[in-house]
Amino acid sequence: MGKRDYYEILGVTRQASEEEIKKAYRKLALKYHPDRNPGDKDSEELFKEAAEAYEVLHDAQKKRIYDTYGHEGLRGTGFSGFRGFEDIFSSFGDVFQEFFNFGFGAGGQSRTAARPGDDLLYDLSLTFEEAVFGTEKEIRLQTLTTCEECNGSGAEPGTRETVCPVCQGSGQVVQSQGFFRISATCTRCQGMGKVLVSPCKTCNGQGRTRQSKTVQVRVPAGVDTGTRLRLRGEGESGYRGGVAGDLYVRLHVNPHEFFERDGDNLYCKVSVSFAQAILGDQIEIPTLDGGRELKIQPGTQPGAVIRFSGEGVPRLRGYGRGDLFIEVEVKIPTRITPRQEEIVTEFMQIEKEKSGEKVRKWPWSKRKDREKKSMAESTREART
């Protein structure tokens, strides 16, 4: 039975990048590793098959030959795959060190004492204006910071580390399992290769202590709820001098009493009287930049939208600003004075005449007419 296609084995395309090939191999190596499948012959074969495919596809020269001539071309170079696990672990010791955090055989690399600190997440609330125009905030948080007594080393001042007596400084101990050897983390030094003769009393050998610290956060203009700001190195300090983690600030923006936001655009509503809508007017409206004049054109209809370009929210990743959209609402009064009634009635009379219709008076208009007629008759009777 002929060999399977190497790309098919790893589950990648012929255009896959080196990183994609490595990622695919890691997945298969984890799945079919002998330690996870003891005594499973099928898994052993799949493990070897994946290793052979990776050996070819991660090597630029072998990959070029394979892409051009296939398996036959590789045989011409003397490549015949791996004979057993020892060949695989010997060839890919550094790869397995990266994949599994431990090595195989005596070639495994020792771990360093330092370990990076964890990342932190902080929730920060902003006003609407702060989110739109940007601001600077000072936040205070409790976190692990570098021990000032030992300067992060974990050792009592004046003392130093010594080589671990168990692993002799390698950070690993070798365990034999069948026909291959596995290097596991040394439990005495936790893989560090060194032990403290006299741990720092302030931090108990950790190289860091929990402290309160303040951090300045620069919030750029145009952020919104859900935006995350990354502050490199402002997370937890590393263990025994390791690099610090990062601080992620998650933003929450409070709503505005007048404006609503959608992306970089702002929306609001203004109310005008029906007389202003008919005749037009000049009114003042609030904007994020201060008050400004808004001209209501004669005959403005309810629901009309007026747009002001460039008066919205500054674009977070770009130049310029969004737009401001103003919707006009026309207020209809529920109570009017007799004088207003006369004017509106006359206006309606004109409108009806223009369209050839007869004016129908409002109920309260008829009542007023009856009252006026009655008063006139009473006046005539009094005179006689």
UniProtKB/Swiss-Prot annotation:
Binding locations of Zn(2+) 2: 164, 167, 186, 189
Disordered: annotated segments: 352-384
Residues noted as binding Zn(2+) 1 in the record, renumbered to the chain: 147, 150, 200, 203
InterPro entries: DnaJ, DnaJ_C, DnaJ_domain, DnaJ_domain_CS, HSP40/DnaJ_pept-bd, HSP_DnaJ_Cys-rich_dom, HSP_DnaJ_Cys-rich_dom_sf, J_dom_sf
Main localisation: cytoplasm
GO molecular function, one term: zinc ion binding
Chain intervals annotated as zinc finger (CR-type): 134-212
A Pfam family: DnaJ_CXXCXGXG
Residue ranges occupied by any J domain in the UniProt entry: 5-70
SMART domains documented for this protein: DnaJ
Entry function: Participates actively in the response to hyperosmotic and heat shock by preventing the aggregation of stress-denatured proteins and by disaggregating proteins, also in an autonomous, DnaK-independent fashion. Unfolded proteins bind initially to DnaJ; upon interaction with the DnaJ-bound protein, DnaK hydrolyzes its bound ATP, resulting in the formation of a stable complex. GrpE releases ADP from DnaK; ATP binding to DnaK triggers the release of the substrate protein, thus completing the reaction cycle.
Subunit and partners: Homodimer.
NCBIfam families: DnaJ_bact, PRK10767.1, PRK14294.1
The protein's name in its UniProt record: Chaperone protein DnaJ
Organism: Syntrophobacter fumaroxidans (strain DSM 10017 / MPOB)
